[in-house]
Every structure is written in C-alpha cells, then in structure tokens.
Amino acid sequence: MIVLMAGLPGTGKTTLARELAARTSGRVLSKDEFRHSLFAAEEIEYSSRQDDFCLQIMLETAGYLLSRNSARLIFLDGRPFSRRYQIENVLAVASSLHQPWRILECVCSEETARRRLEWDAASGTHAAGNRNYQLYLEVKARFEAIRSRKTVIDTDLGIEVCVQSAMKSVNH
C-alpha cells in the first residue's frame, strides 16, 4: 500500500509516518532525504521541478520495494502534496502497481506548526533548509484542497490518537 503523508509544513507528517512505519514494518520514503542523497548542497534548489524529480525517484523506489513485498506499507513523506497533480501522479503509479493507496492529511493549529518549525530550525533536526514558518504561510496560500478520499488527522491531539486514527485508515 502507498500512503501519502499530506499537509502543511510542521503539521507532523514525518513524526506520524515514522511511528506508523515502526509499528507496521513499513518504510518511509522522504523527499528531503532523497534530495540530499541525490544532489550536492550547491545543487539543491527547493524548486517544484526538483521536488517532482525526487518524487518520481521515490515512486520508482516504492515500486521496487512493493515488487519484493506487495503487502508492505510505503509512506511517502517530505512533500505537502499541496497540488492536485502531485496526488494524481502518485495515485496513477499506485494503480499501475495494482496497489491500494491512502491519503493521511495532517493538520494542526497554526501556533503548533509555528512552534514545531521554530524548534526544528533551532535544533537543526530537519533536512530541508527552506522549512520555516514563512514556507508554511506560502504553501498554505496555494494549497489546493484534497478532493480524493482522505483521512484528516489532527496532530494537536497527540501521537497515540493520531496513530490510532491512521491505523484505522490503512487497515480499512
């Protein structure tokens, strides 16, 4: 199964994806980690073109992993999936792989997102160098509502509640 971790920066997508992968023997494929593996620091653009390229490599990797174990959960992380074409591309690949898919849209209050983003920036724990509250506001302004079937997860509620909600979705 391919699981898209959607939502604005700082909404808890990575934390939830990692927890779900640990509990299900799944695999998190992170766009930010792929980007840093593929490009030298001076080549990193944080552009839609480079993001789309990284996502394509992630989808090829997902296909390879699923060909070895079709029951595995693959969590696609590191992209807000703020544009419909991004989701449509993933769903087309899932269909071509004969894989079910789920969309988990993480949401939280703006204050929580701001706090998380500021903490990540201060601690240097996140791979994306452009990830800050300004990016949150920019992505929010252009975020296209997800019209595909999805489960909305309020990450202000705590990790256990979020995991339970997500597990209901992926097991359904």
Residue ranges and their predicted role:
Residues 122-165:
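Small-molecule kinase domains that catalyze NTP-dependent phosphoryl transfer to phosphate-bearing small molecules
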Residues 2:
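Walker A (P-loop) ATP-phosphate-binding motif of ABC ATPase nucleotide-binding domains
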Residues 53-97:
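Glycine-rich phosphate-binding loop used to anchor ATP phosphates in small-molecule kinases
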